[in-house]
Amino acid sequence: MKFDKIYTAKRIAEWLQAELIGDPNQEFKGMNEIHKVEAGDIMFVDVPKYFKKAFQSAATGIIVNEAVEPPSGKCVFVVSDPFRAYETLGARFYRFEALN
């Protein structure tokens, strides 16, 4: 899913009320799941055993629940509930309507 424009890591961290580890000026253009991420995308991972796979993915930003040092060129957003933060970010850009 692509954002309506490019946003900085600092701005996204503010929206998520996350601790940011990495470059606050890093730019993001969208979000997606681990198998579909591209450079400039954000994903989440909430199980530490998958952190390595997330860091090896094309994602530029990863929402996690532990403060870890990201590889060069990536940012980490630390929150208590990564899935909820990912949902919050998605809801900011994509309005979901219930089917009746």
At which residue positions do the language-model features occur?
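Terminal amphipathic alpha-helical/low-complexity segments used for targeting or macromolecular assembly
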Residues: M1-N100
